[in-house]
């Protein structure tokens, strides 16, 4: 009947979450610095988010060391994911795919590697679950995209793309042109 009962578990989750976030930012900053010879604040912040996403699946099962490892690897995965999307010429201006998809997959699988019930069986459960959820999401998205495409299309015209969607949709720019060199 007491609200404070079990707060030790809450504090543990808070600590593992904060450690993973810090390690994600640090991992992304160091890795992107080594890779690009440049420290980029957006890569650092996406690394923090990658660390947070990575630890979410197992924050209750990890100790501080595991949280730091999962967060740092999550941050590095974000940097590699951004590079992969750039190489594939896929547009993701805020890095949502590397942060949420790639670091999320890592965090889900990491439960099977580092969690309280880690082991081969748990790893396989995490891997299979990730595949099942991924397949469901891909199939659902394709169905929705096909419906939207048949009703109104999925792309804007090249002219609208060049002008910028803020200008076309809202008749003004949400960012001044000096922000992006226009």
Language-model-detected regions and their locations in the chain:
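Single conserved hydrophobic/aromatic residue that forms the stacking wall/gate
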Residues: 1-11, 172, 177-182
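Helix-coil boundary and interhelical linker segments in multi-pass alpha-helical membrane proteins
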Residues: 5, 9, 56-65
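Structural signal for the N-terminal portions of transmembrane helices
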Residues: 9, 13, 118-135
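Structural signature of hydrophobic alpha-helical transmembrane segments
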Residues: 12-21, 65-73
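Transmembrane alpha-helical segments of multi-pass membrane transport proteins and ion-pumping complexes
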Residues: 20-33, 48-55, 59, 71-83, ...
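Membrane-helix interface "capping/anchor" motifs
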Residues: 33-42, 87-92
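Cytoplasmic-side transmembrane-helix entry/capping segments in multi-pass membrane proteins
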Residues: 39-48, 95-98
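Extramembrane terminal tails and long inter-domain/linker segments of multi-pass membrane proteins
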Residues: 150-173
């Amino acid at each position: 009947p007491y609200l404070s009962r079990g707060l030790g578990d809450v504090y543990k989750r808070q600590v593992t979450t904060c450690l993973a976030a810090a390690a994600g930012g640090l991992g992304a900053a160091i890795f992107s610095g080594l890779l690009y010879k440049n420290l980029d604040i957006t890569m650092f912040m996406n690394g923090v988010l990658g660390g947070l996403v990575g630890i979410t699946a197992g924050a209750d099962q990890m100790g501080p060391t595991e949280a730091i490892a999962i967060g740092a690897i999550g941050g590095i995965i974000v940097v590699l994911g951004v590079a992969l999307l750039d190489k594939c010429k896929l547009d993701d201006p805020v890095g949502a795919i590397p942060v949420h998809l790639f670091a999320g997959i890592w965090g889900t699988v990491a439960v099977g590697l580092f969690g309280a019930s880690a082991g081969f069986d748990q790893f396989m459960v995490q891997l299979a679950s990730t595949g099942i959820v991924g397949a469901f999401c891909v199939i659902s998205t394709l169905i929705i995209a096909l419906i939207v495409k048949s009703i109104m299309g999925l792309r804007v015209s090249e002219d609208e793309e060049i002008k910028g969607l803020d200008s076309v949709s809202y008749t003004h720019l949400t960012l001044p042109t000096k922000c992006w060199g226009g």
